[in-house]
C-alpha cells in the first residue's frame, strides 16, 4: 500500500493497467467505427440537394438491437474506472486537481485541434475551388459527433477530482444526487427544452460515477447473482419507462441530449463488465489480443476523432463522381458496406501515422509550477464554447475555423508539446515514483 494513501485512509492503489478495461475500450471503439460505417448514407436528390441519411438507424428492427450496441455509457464507465485510479496515483504524488485537468485537457484537445485545423483548411480550399456548398456542409458535419462526445467527456473528466472526493465520502449518496439531477432535468425538459442539454453533464458524470463504484468493487464484493440481478433490474426498469411512453425506445434518439435511459444502460453495462470479467480477462490475456489492444489504445482518440470525418469526406467525394450510388437500405447498399468499412480503415492508417503521436502523454513535471490555475480554466472555456455551440446550432465551416483557433489557443495556454518521456526520478532525483510510461496511457488516460 502506498504510504500517502494509507495515511489518508484511501483504498490501495490499483495496477497501472487493467487488460479487461483495455479490451472493453477496444471493443467500444471498434463497434463505433463499424456502426458508423453502416449508418452514414449521403443522398443526392433530383433537385440537386444533398442530405445525409441514417439508413441503419431508420430500420425498425434496429431499435431493440441498439439497446445492446449503444455502448457510449461503457466508454464513460471505463473512463471513470481509469480516471479515478489515475487521479489517486497523481494525488498521492502531490499532484493537484488543476494538474490532473491540465493533462486530461491536453491529451484530448491536441489531436482535436489538428483535426479541426486540417478540416477547415481543406474544406475552405474546396469551397474556393468551386465544390458545391451543400457537399461542403455535408463534409463539415462529419466532425459534429466527435465534438459533442469530446465536450461531454471533457466535462466529466474536468469534474472528476471533486466528484472523486465526494465519492470517497459518500459514494452511493453522490450517485443518488447525480441521478436526481438527471431525473429533474428530464422532468423539466418539456417545459424548457434547452434545459435538456444540462444532462450532457449530469448523465455522463453519473455514468462516470458508476465507474468509480466499479473501481472500488473489491470492497463491495458483489456476487455473480447480484450482478446478474442488477442487469435484469436496470433493463426491466428501462423497458417499463419505454412501455409507459416516457422515453423513446430508440437509444440513438435518447443519446443527444442524453437522458435517464443512458444512465440505466450504464448500470447494466457496468454490471455486465464485472459479471463477465473472468472470461474477458482470459481473452485479454492472450498475447496477440494484448498486443492488438495495446497498439489500438495508443491511438484511440485519433481513430475516434477522424473516422467519421473521413467517412463523410469519402461519401461526399463519391457524390462528385459517376460512381454507382445505390439507394440506402437496398441489397446493393448493404453489400457495399464492408467495402466502405475497409476504405475507412485504409484512410485511417496514414492519419494515425501522421497524427497519432499527438496522443503521447505529456512529460510529467512539478504540478503547475509557475502556471496559474486561471490558464487551465481559460483553456477549458476556449474548448467548451465552440463545442457547445456545435451541439446547439450544428457545425458550420465558420464554426470549424473558430473551433480550430480556440482549440489551438487552449493548447498554447496549457503550454506543452509531445516530447520524449524522461522519468521524474532521473531529472530531479526525487523519491516519488514516476507516472506510467506512454504505453500505459491507453489505460490510465481517457
Which residues fall in each region the model found?
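Alpha-helical transmembrane segments and their immediate juxtamembrane cytosolic regions
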Residues: 2-434, 438-446
Amino acid at each position: 500500500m502506498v504510504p500517502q494513501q494509507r495515511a489518508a485512509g484511501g483504498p490501495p492503489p490499483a495496477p497501472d493497467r487493467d487488460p479487461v478495461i483495455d479490451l472493453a475500450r477496444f471493443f467500444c471503439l471498434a463497434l463505433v467505427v463499424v456502426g458508423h460505417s453502416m449508418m452514414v448514407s449521403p443522398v443526392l436528390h433530383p433537385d440537386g440537394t444533398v442530405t445525409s441519411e441514417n439508413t441503419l438507424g431508420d430500420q425498425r428492427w434496429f431499435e431493440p438491437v441498439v439497446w445492446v450496441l449503444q455502448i457510449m455509457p461503457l466508454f464513460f464507465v471505463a473512463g471513470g474506472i481509469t480516471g479515478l485510479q489515475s487521479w489517486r496515483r497523481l494525488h498521492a504524488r502531490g499532484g493537484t486537481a488543476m494538474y490532473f485537468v491540465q493533462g486530461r485537457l491536453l491529451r484530448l484537445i491536441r489531436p482535436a485541434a489538428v483535426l479541426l485545423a486540417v478540416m477547415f483548411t481543406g474544406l475552405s480550399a474546396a469551397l474556393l475551388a468551386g465544390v458545391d456548398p451543400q457537399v461542403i456542409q455535408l463534409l463539415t458535419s462529419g466532425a459534429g459527433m466527435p465534438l459533442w462526445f469530446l465536450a461531454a467527456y471533457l466535462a466529466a473528466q474536468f469534474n472528476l477530482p471533486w466528484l472523486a472526493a465526494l465519492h470517497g465520502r459518500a459514494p452511493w449518496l453522490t450517485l443518488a444526487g447525480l441521478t436526481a439531477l438527471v431525473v429533474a432535468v428530464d422532468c423539466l425538459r418539456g417545459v424548457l427544452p434547452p434545459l435538456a442539454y444540462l444532462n450532457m453533464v449530469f448523465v455522463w458524470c453519473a455514468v462516470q460515477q458508476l465507474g468509480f463504484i466499479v473501481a472500488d468493487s473489491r470492497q463491495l464484493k458483489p456476487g455473480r447473482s447480484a450482478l446478474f440481478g442488477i442487469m435484469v433490474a436496470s433493463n426491466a426498469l428501462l423497458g417499463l419507462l419505454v412501455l409507459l411512453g416516457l422515453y423513446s425506445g430508440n437509444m440513438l434518439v435518447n443519446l443527444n441530449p442524453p437522458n435517464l435511459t443512458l444512465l440505466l444502460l450504464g448500470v447494466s453495462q457496468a454490471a455486465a463488465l464485472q459479471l463477465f470479467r473472468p472470461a474477458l480477462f482470459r481473452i485479454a490475456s492472450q498475447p496477440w489480443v494484448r498486443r492488438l489492444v495495446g497498439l489500438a489504445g495508443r491511438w484511440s482518440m485519433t481513430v475516434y476523432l477522424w473516422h467519421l470525418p473521413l467517412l463523410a469526406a469519402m461519401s461526399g467525394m463519391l457524390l462528385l463522381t459517376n460512381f454507382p450510388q445505390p439507394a440506402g437500405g437496398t441489397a446493393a447498399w448493404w453489400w457495399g458496406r464492408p467495402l466502405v468499412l475497409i476504405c475507412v480503415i485504409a484512410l485511417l492508417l496514414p492519419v494515425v501515422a501522421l497524427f497519432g503521436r499527438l496522443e503521447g502523454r505529456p512529460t510529467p513535471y512539478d504540478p503547475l509550477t509557475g502556471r496559474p490555475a486561471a490558464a487551465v480554466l481559460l483553456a477549458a472555456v476556449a474548448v467548451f464554447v465552440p463545442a457547445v455551440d456545435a451541439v446547439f446550432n450544428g457545425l458550420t465551416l465558420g464554426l470549424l475555423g473558430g473551433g480550430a483557433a480556440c482549440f489551438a489557443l487552449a493548447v498554447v495556454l496549457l503550454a506543452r508539446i509531445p516530447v520524449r518521456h524522461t522519468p521524474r526520478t532521473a531529472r530531479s532525483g526525487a523519491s516519488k515514483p514516476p507516472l506510467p510510461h506512454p504505453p500505459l496511457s491507453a489505460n490510465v488516460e481517457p
